[in-house]
Amino acid sequence: RMVNQNRNVFSACMVACGDAQAMVTGLTRGFRVSFDEVTRAIGPATSATVMGLTTIHARERTVIIADTLVHEIPTPAQLADIAQQSAEAARRTGLEPRVAFVSFSNFGSPPMPSGERVAEAVSILDKRGVSFEYDGDMSADVALDHELMKRLYPFARLSGAANVLVMPNL
């Protein structure tokens, strides 16, 4: 009955069964309702951190923003997982991921709790030996403007403007 009467549950089941590659929702229901319906129907993958991705396409540029929907204050391990899963999502859409952990501070200046969590997340990714570029913490303007990044922070690891932004808190 739940599958037949709820379009989110029906769509989620189609994705889970391989009859659809993705689902789009939210026009008539808010995020929390949609999220609860989908996770109740199919649940998260056991090896994944549940998160939300927002994709913006503008001016011949694509930027993925994570996680702006699920984790209010993610732990460093969750931030590392979110970065890794976001990079995988970027690759699936044809982007070569350049991940920036966005914050109010830039590389620990001024010192902030979110910056400390980001520094630990970067350390976790270093230990994992992931195959994508990542750096942070940095402000959004620095992350999205590679010339500014290189001028102000020549030690930054990213080879271009970030195309994946990971938020350390909502």
Predicted segment positions?
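Anion-binding alpha/beta catalytic cores of soluble intermediary-metabolism enzymes, centered on
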Residues: 1-159, 163-170
